[in-house]
């Protein structure tokens, strides 16, 4: 008879990973990041448990996109006021808030609901190469 192993949330303390986004493709990086956050590569993967993996992405300002998406891809946000729609291109948003692009891409891939919001809090994105998480000794994640 097969036995299903059910992992409790308290057991795993999670791992810290670091990813260098220099010259990485936006979609591929976001996809691998989301899979690691969800815990798909964990031997005890369960879709309803937060594996508590924390990912630090550095050099988010050096991410690349293929084709003409730098000028043709749009990001929308609305203030809630009448006529409050703001449209920015990839290039404009990258110059203003470079980490926001990766955050939006990963958030769109993560599951929708309470667990997805909890997983998104485990993503830390920084534009430069420095970050305040050196004390956690993050493991380099090669893609």
Swiss-Prot record:
Subcellular location(s) per record: Plastid, Chloroplast
Gene Ontology biological-process annotations: negative regulation of translation; translation
Chief localization: plastid
Molecular function as annotated in GO: mRNA binding; structural constituent of ribosome
InterPro entries assigned: Ribosomal_uL13 (IPR005822), Ribosomal_uL13_bac-type (IPR005823), Ribosomal_uL13_sf (IPR036899)
UniProt keyword list: Chloroplast, Plastid, Ribonucleoprotein, Ribosomal protein
Domain of life: Eukaryota
A single GO cellular-component term on record: chloroplast
Family: Belongs to the universal ribosomal protein uL13 family.
Assembly and interaction partners: Part of the 50S ribosomal subunit.
Stored NCBIfam families: rplM_bact
HAMAP family xrefs: Ribosomal_uL13 (MF_01366)
Full protein name: Large ribosomal subunit protein uL13c
Naturally occurring in which organism (per UniProt): Guillardia theta (Cryptophyte)
Lineage: Eukaryota, Cryptophyceae, Pyrenomonadales, Geminigeraceae, Guillardia
Gene name, Swiss-Prot/TrEMBL: rpl13
